[in-house]
Amino acid sequence: MKVVTLKDIPNVPMEGAERIEGYTGPVSRSRQTIIQPGDSANYNCSVVNFSQRCTTGWHTHNCDQVLVVTSGSGMVANEHEQREINAGDVVHIKAGERHWHGAKADSTMGHITITAFGSQATHG
């Protein structure tokens, strides 16, 4: 068993930050790895933190993805709908579903992401 406190996990900058439509300023996102590579045969689990107006851009996963919003407010969208998400919300995205998620224009957002170990994301 392992217990971690989110504030104690290093925040590592990530590439691939996308702007919300119509915004041209800087955006950033970072990752706090909860389950270290090799510590689980089944899951990847991290916190991803988004600056205001930052999204993942469109992508798919070859496994289901679960998001647990830990702070702030954001949006999640697929090709059919866009929904606001807030701290405490949980999102289930099916394998192969084209989607994006990120912070709103007026808020940062953090979420825990859970995917299958060895799974892949494809952007675009």
Regions found by a protein language model. Give the residues of each.
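Glycine- and acidic-residue-biased ligand/ion/polar-headgroup-sensing regions
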Residues: 63-74, 79
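Short acidic-glycine-tyrosine-enriched beta hairpin
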Residues: 80-96
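Short beta-strand His + acidic residue motifs that chelate non-heme Fe in jelly-roll/DSBH
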Residues: 56-58, 76-77, 98-105
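A short, N-terminal "cap"/entry segment at the start of jelly-roll beta-barrel domains
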Residues: 1-42, 122-124
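A short hydrophobic beta-strand segment most commonly corresponding to one strand
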Residues: 92, 106-124
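Conserved short histidine dyad/triad with adjacent acidic residue
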Residues: 44-61, 95
